[in-house]
Amino acid sequence: MAPAARPSAAWRLVFALSLLLGAALPASAQTVATYHGHADRSGNFVMPQFTWARARTLHLDTGFAPRFTGHLYAQPLYWRPAGSTSGVLIVASESNVVAAIDSRSGATLWSRSLGPPAPLSTFPCGNIDPLGVTGTPVIDPASGTLYLDAMVLDGGRPHQRVYALSLGDGAVKPGWPIDVADALRAAGHRFDPRVQNQRAALLLLNGTVYIGFGGFYGDCGDYHGWVVGVPTGRPDHVLVWRSQARGGAVWAPGGIASDGRFLYFSTGNTFGARKWAGGEAVFRMPPSLQSSGGPSSFFAPADWRQLDASDLDLGATNPLPLALQGGAQPLLLALGKDRRAYLLDRQNLGGIGGSLVSRRVAARPILTAPALYAQDGSAKVVFQGRGADCPSVRDGDLTVLRIIPGNPPGLATAWCGAMSGRGAPIVTTTDGASEPIVWILGAEGDNRLHGFRGDDGTALYTGPPLQGLRHFQTLIAADNRLFVGADGRLYAFSLSP
């Protein structure tokens, strides 16, 4: 393992002070510590300067051009050490390079190589070459620790390893990394990293890091869906959930969501299952990952067999917890490659066929993470995908749904946005609710950053083409700017004075 580039003495002092003072600042002002900024994966960022009027002045900051090694699929993270005048951007690439970058100057504060990534030829199928870090890492601001999973080639064999790195200098913390196959073997399970891939964003909840695993593009080998919980204090004592049948991948880029009490995740298609065995489903799990298995703890569409046969699974998109105004029941939204939206009772997911509402909302399979915002007494959910009910004048690869309180709740298309590509959206508001703006990257499409008014879909901003965007790429909002990760580099967008 290569040593980290040595951070400056000034940076080491700032890092030490941040651990002492971190509790003094609200977390939202300091960090984008996880995928979509929140454990619930809402993707809603408070940015007081980002009004509808000023969004039209956004521009690419050409003076900000940090570089690193490797392709980038994981979302960047942002951490503001207490007492610091600038934040730190964290990127983790498919070359197994993790870098900390000053958010103002673009200077590299430290860089760490976790070891050689695995070439595609190592695996019986797949589409990422080489394969290193794919799932978005997670930050624990209280301890100044970054947790991530990496595929490392060691002794000619691939290994899934979970790392804990110091945010101060990138050093691997004592007791880490954890070899996933070894930890699961000690718990009585067989895990083969040659057919088990890690795409889902990591989640940190109550001192445990939760990691979803699935298969490779091509569905080769005897893989299963897994959720592995790694306690940060005892990383060799893992918690485990596994799909019963072959398949059932936990692979959505948004990973596992949480409302602070339970974990929510979706699974992909299974193979050869004569009775339902954990695929095509949404699960609610306690942090122990031990569930009764009753119908209140899972949902699967009634046509799960047909979805299995057609590879139209629910596993491509993370579930989204939401609540409507007026004290209505807490809900969970699931979106599928079957082009449907499913509204579920979060306290009773309903078992097979037990959704509150099921409606076709997209003209094509839905594949990326949704985002959530509130407006006019309803919840709005935005996803990348061509809507089923879009007006032709606004036809494009962005759809916003409106969820209306009621018994059952109402579900309708609010508006659609004209753009092309497969990024995942986020939302900025000035105070948590006002002047919402939907932002999305046209990754592997027009490759531009787009901004739309959240109330009616009016286009506010279309940026220049960007190089190196990978599908499902997700931007973040922090430090009065928007940051975009791409192969080997970061972009920043700023408002004009």
Kindly give the residue locations of the regions a language model identified:
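Mobile, glycine-rich extracellular loop/lid and propeptide segments
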Residues: Q30-Q290, P295-Q325, Q329-G351, L367-Q375, ...
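Compositionally biased, intrinsically disordered low-complexity segments
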Residues: P7, L17, A183, E435-I437
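Bacterial N-terminal signal peptides
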Residues: R12-A24
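Short, charged low-complexity linker/loop segments at the C-terminal edge of domains
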Residues: P408, S496-P497
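N-terminal secretory signal peptides that target proteins for export/translocation
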Residues: M1-A10
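Sec/Tat signal peptide C-region and signal peptidase I cleavage site
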Residues: L25-A29
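Inter-blade linker and blade-boundary elements of WD-repeat/beta-propeller domains
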Residues: G353-A363, A412-W415
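Detector for outer-membrane/organellar transmembrane beta-barrel domains
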Residues: D395-V400, P405-A424
